[in-house]
Amino acid sequence: MDILIISLKSLGYSRTARPLDSSPLVVHAVAGAGKSTALRKLLARHSTFTVHTLGVPDKISIRTRGIQKPGPIPEGNFAILDEYTLDATTREAYQALFADPYQAPELSLEPHFYLETSFRTPTKAAALIASCGFDFETNSQEEGHLEITGIFKGPLLGKVIAIDSEAETTLSRHGVEFVKPCQVTGLEFPVVTIVSAAPIEEIGQSTLFYNAITRSKGLTYVRAGA
């Protein structure tokens, strides 16, 4: 665990008041904070770590084990579970849990370490996220593009994400391919369009909206409300 704690401190994670002798070790980071990248580096440098995820696993590589789906843990290895908030029943075998608590706050635990800074989210999108009440900031040098209009007031570009059932029905009726926020956890796209039948004032503080807008690393379009 000492190696992991040293790594977290070097990456700018802050400590909470929760004692380190309480287990498992819980680490929280906002979307785009480099959580998965840090875990991959840990795997590459130390063979005694195993990292599983409830999100999207790494592709098979001949050079590294990568982040895998939950499975057998080599005896003696320090086991880490990423995206732990996606399932409350898969935590017992792990000594450390990582997640973005905003993606599933109802299943989040009190953390030992946290990081509120994203390195991916463009500044305009980050400002909108923060204005909706999330503790969120960005170090990205990209301003990005943010456009907010009614649901029928602009084109649907890039990866289209529907965040309510009415939006899903509307998109299906018009033959538009879309995904739900839960289908793109841990992924990122250069262009994202978020579609909702409700206006931004109603959806801004929702987990689904947060999950959707943090998938964008460039151009962000919000088509919401009438």
Swiss-Prot record:
GO terms for biological process: symbiont-mediated suppression of host innate immune response; transport of virus in host, cell to cell. One of its GO terms (cellular component) is host cell cytoplasm. InterPro entries: (+)RNA_virus_helicase_core_dom. It is found in: Host cytoplasm. Residues 1-138 form the (+)RNA virus helicase ATP-binding domain. It holds the Pfam family Viral_helicase1. Its main location: host cell. The keyword Transport applies. Homodimer and homooligomer. Interacts with capsid protein. Interacts with host AGO1; this interaction targets the host protein for degradation, thereby suppressing the antiviral RNA silencing. Belongs to the Tymovirales TGBp1 protein family. TGBp1, TGBp2 and TGBp3 seem to act together for cell-to-cell propagation. TGBp1 is the main movement protein that physically cross the plasmodesma with the viral genome. TGBp2 and TGBp3 would facilitate TGBp1 function. This is Movement and silencing protein TGBp1. It comes from Potato virus X (strain CP) (PVX).
